[in-house]
Amino acid sequence: MHYKISLWFIMDKSDILGYILILFILVICAYIYFDTDSFQLKCIVSTVDGNKYCVRERDQVQKAADLLAKITQKCKKLVDYVDKKYPEKENIRRLVNGYNPQKIMETLPTSQYTAYSENKGEKLAFCLNRKKNDNDNLIDEHTLMFVAIHELSHVATKSIGHKDEFWQNFKFLLQEAKEANIHNPEDYKQSPKEYCGMSIKDNPYFDS
């Protein structure tokens, strides 16, 4: 027994620090892994475009992935449309350079946001539910496209938040989406829509 205790005390301090460092790194790696989107979401290959989309675990995971694929296709079509039509406009250059169709996913179950753009388009995430915690009822494609254009408007906007510049870009993209037959704007003042537990009551397309 005395021999074993002696070995412990003569152990090089650098060895102990090395073990502590390794343990610390393992804990950090585990935290990062379990906090990633891929761990909290289920990634499904869409039958629409063959790409993989990460969505919440639900009975309709395939429908959810296909819904994101359809929205991604429409967003790409809109971005390409305005890029060809307005190649010199600064807001369009920001949109074209910022939008990343490879990083479209559903919001995490723990997310406080209904939808968001990370780093001005590096990643777009959407709640796909009509009611916030009801994974059984997906939002309709038309309403989700309105939300997607809202997020694309953030990508096109230099300022942060919902300032005048944002609302001008939002209305502009809605007008272009209408002209390109990508999205037919709906007057939510006349007919509000429920989306992820909130009510959409306004559409800047109809603002004078």
Residue ranges and their predicted role:
Residues M1-K4, S208:
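Compositionally biased low-complexity segments enriched in polar/charged residues
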Residues I5-Y33:
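Single-pass alpha-helical membrane anchors
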Residues L23-D49, R58-I139, S159-S208:
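Metalloprotease/metallohydrolase-associated module, dominated by Zn2+-dependent proteases
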Residues G50-V55, M145-I149:
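Surface-exposed beta-strand-to-loop junctions
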